UniProtKB/Swiss-Prot annotation:
It holds the Pfam family Ribosomal_L13. It comes from Aliarcobacter butzleri (strain RM4018) (Arcobacter butzleri). Part of the 50S ribosomal subunit. Keywords: Ribonucleoprotein, Ribosomal protein. This is Large ribosomal subunit protein uL13. Gene3D superfamilies: Ribosomal protein L13.
Amino acid sequence: MKFTQMAHANEIKRDWIVVDATDKVFGRIITEVATILRGKNKPCFTPNVDCGDFVVIINASKAKFSGKKLESKNYFTHSGYFGSTKTHKMSEMFEKNPEKLYKLATRGMLPKTTLGKEMLKKLKVYAGSEHPHTAQIKG
């Protein structure tokens, strides 16, 4: 009788995947990236093991948005002090720091556990086409 093989953390082989965000819809990029970071595209996927790959997003500032999200969507921050709630429009965040916007959106699609935080560390986002990870990427 055969049993299901479970992946172990020391057996996982991680690849580096480059995603070019030029003229792609923001949400579709994020769902693709979250699937790769989680490892759900691999046959050895195990929910309690971080079996995802590293993802490098380049040209992050050239993505498109569907609908009127840039004007209508707001992000809230709070420092912990009374009355310190701040609201930022998505368009402001995308102009100032697109890397943070990608990380926030991807974090929302990953598990809210320590495993999810480890998965998010494997995401590298760059606004331009240059990145320092060319040595790790094959092909």
